Amino acid sequence: MEDLKKVVAYKAVDEYVQSNTTIGLGTGSTVFYVLERIETLMKSGKIKNLVCVPTSIDTEMKAKSLGIPLTGLTKNLKIDIAIDGADEVDSDLNLIKGRGGALVREKLVAANTACFIVIVDESKMCEDGLGTTGAVPIEILSFGYEMIIESLLKISALKNCTYKLREKDGEIFITDNHNYIVDFFFETPIENLVKTCEQIKMTTGVVDHGIFANMASIALISKSNGTILTLNKNK
C-alpha cells in the first residue's frame, strides 16, 4: 500500500506543482511523499520559488526538515493548488477526512485554493456512499463537550450512530487548535450528505466536520495494477 501512496503522490507533484506558486499541503502519510518529491525537484532546480502552506504541525515540521519554504494562511494569500489525502472518496469526489486529526486546517486550506487535488489509493474509493469504512470525525470545543455531543445526536443522520470521544495514549486527543474530536460511526452510507453537513456545522460548539462535500477538483487514485485513475469534478 505504501508503494501506491508514493506513486500517486509523485504523480500529483510532477503533474500539478509548478514554479512560482503557493501550494497547500495536507496531512498524513501520503502527503509525506508529496513533501519528499517536492524536496527532490527543488534541489534539482526543476521547481523554483515555491512556498507551501501546511495544515498541521506534523506537516510543518516535516517540511521544515526538508528545507521547503513555508507561509501561514494570511488575508491576501493566493493558494494555487492544495494537495491532500482522504480517508474515503465517492464517485462525486465528496470526501471523508480528518481521521488524522487535522480536519479544520485541511478544510480551511481546501476552501481557499483554486484547485484542490485529492490523492488516494484504490482502497479509499467508496462507490456506494461515504461513512462506512471508519470514523466520521467532528471537531468540537472542549468546553461543554458532552452537551455538544448530545446536540449532535439530535441530527437525523447521527441518531443511530455510535460515537467515541477520540483518545491518544490513554488521554483525550487534543487537536492543533486545542479542541476535541468526537468520532461518529455509521452502519450505512450517510444520507442527504449536504444537508447533514449543514446541520452538523450549525450545531453550537462544533468547529467543523470531516465531510468535504463539493470541495475537491481532482482525484488521483492509485490502483494495484499500476495505473493511476484521474477523476475531474468538472467532467
What are these regions (language model features)?
Residues 1-84:
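N-terminal active-site beta-alpha-beta segment that forms phosphate/nucleotide-binding
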Residues 3-7, 57-235:
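Conserved phosphate- and dinucleotide-binding cores of soluble alpha/beta proteins
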